[in-house]
Amino acid sequence: MNSLSYLNHELEQFPSPEFALTDPNGLLAVGGDLQPKRLLNAYYEGIFPWFNIDDPILWWSPDPRAVFVPGNMKTSRSLLKHLKKQPWRYSINHAFSQVIEGCAAPRSSQDGTWITPEIQDAYLKLHELGKAHSIEVWHQDELIGGLYGLATGQVFCGESMFHTQTNASKAAMLLLHQHLLKQGFKLIDAQVMNPHLASLGATALRRKDFINLLKRFRDLPVAADAWARSEVSLEL
């Protein structure tokens, strides 16, 4: 029977994901902090933080794991038709703080948000270090959708996305797929499988298989300008 590990503020070492609990699925450790070194170590090992505002820091590695292969997003004809009609603009790393704020905004389907001010500050630090990145969707000068996540080697670990206009988050996801495919990325970690991710083409992998793929791809190089701040086009 696996037991929960408790982290202190000095050590960044995590227990192996194989020791995560089955109930709740994937809970591996409690405590520690959200300093860049610890966060980068976590993603390198297939672990991510996820907790509510009144909870301690909780670290997870669920089984199964939701993943995409870059370029394999499912797109319906109606979605593509809708996107072709939109006068939207797209960018990379132009408005990271606005994107994470958009993802943290209250939603009618959720009771509160897990993207706490502490989480926002932590990922802003990672962005400043060139480790966390954002995709933006604009209508004129208004940010209407986007997503953010963290890259480790040729693996992109998606964190959250949002939209204020219909299909803007799907446009951001499609742009992410196109960008990662061009840059030679091998895997998108979408963390916890749900019906929405499945409808977009995510696959559920056994944690063991996911970790094996992560180990293959996490140290592979990417172009120095892979995440350069830029205006980009969505190919439809």
Swiss-Prot record:
It is found in: Cytoplasm. The lineage of its organism: Bacteria, Pseudomonadati, Pseudomonadota, Gammaproteobacteria, Alteromonadales. Belongs to the L/F-transferase family. This is Leucyl/phenylalanyl-tRNA--protein transferase. One of its GO terms (biological process) is protein catabolic process. NCBIfam families: aat (TIGR00667). Functions in the N-end rule pathway of protein degradation where it conjugates Leu, Phe and, less efficiently, Met from aminoacyl-tRNAs to the N-termini of proteins containing an N-terminal arginine or lysine. Its EC number is 2.3.2.6. It is an enzyme of class 2 (transferase). It catalyses: N-terminal L-lysyl-[protein] + L-leucyl-tRNA(Leu) = N-terminal L-leucyl-L-lysyl-[protein] + tRNA(Leu) + H(+); N-terminal L-arginyl-[protein] + L-leucyl-tRNA(Leu) = N-terminal L-leucyl-L-arginyl-[protein] + tRNA(Leu) + H(+); L-phenylalanyl-tRNA(Phe) + an N-terminal L-alpha-aminoacyl-[protein] = an N-terminal L-phenylalanyl-L-alpha-aminoacyl-[protein] + tRNA(Phe). It comes from the Bacteria. GO terms for cellular component: cytoplasm. One of its GO terms (molecular function) is leucyl-tRNA--protein transferase activity. Keywords: Acyltransferase, Cytoplasm, Transferase. InterPro entries: Acyl_CoA_acyltransferase, Leu/Phe-tRNA_Trfase, Leu/Phe-tRNA_Trfase_C, Leu/Phe-tRNA_Trfase_N. The keyword Ribonucleoprotein does not apply. SUPFAM superfamilies: Acyl-CoA N-acyltransferases (Nat).
